[in-house]
Amino acid sequence: MTLESFWEKVTESNLRQGDYLVNCPVPVYSEIPQENSWLEIQIGFSDLIIITQSCDLENGKNDLVALCPIYTLAEFEEENPKASQKGFWEQVRKAKIEGFHLLSPFQNPENNRECLVVDFREIYSLPFEFLTKHAASLENRWRLKPPYLEHFSQAFARFFMRVGLPANIPPFK
């Protein structure tokens, strides 16, 4: 069975959950400001994927849009050497490592070394109008297709709704 792409190309400027926004400007804070003082903020650039629900985006319910960074495996491994250990990505693929979600590459879904990884542990919140203008400037961009979009959304929900217990029921022997 041939694996189809998880993605479709879109040219419209409207935003939806699962939209991949390349080279998006994000604030980078270097220090905590003192009261009544100015703070210089650096601007970084990151590839991001929208996690805000499409219905909220379409109905204008949000002034801010939630996004997570998305990386190629090589980019992620460069910053996180532990990720290059044997078996790491297989555990992520099986949803055994919290906070990460794998998505197929845009062009060659059969090659899992070209996969993309979403890091749910880092969430940005950027203005809706700003992102709409950024999306319009991209001309073509990628958007997750169903049912991969729903799978992605559910993975984020599972990560976000975790509850850590102080103690657990002991294992059965």
Model regions: which residues?
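A structural micro-motif recognizing beta-strand termini
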Residues: 10, 24-26
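Short, charged beta-turn/beta-strand-edge "cap" motif at the junction between a beta-strand
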Residues: 26-30, 55
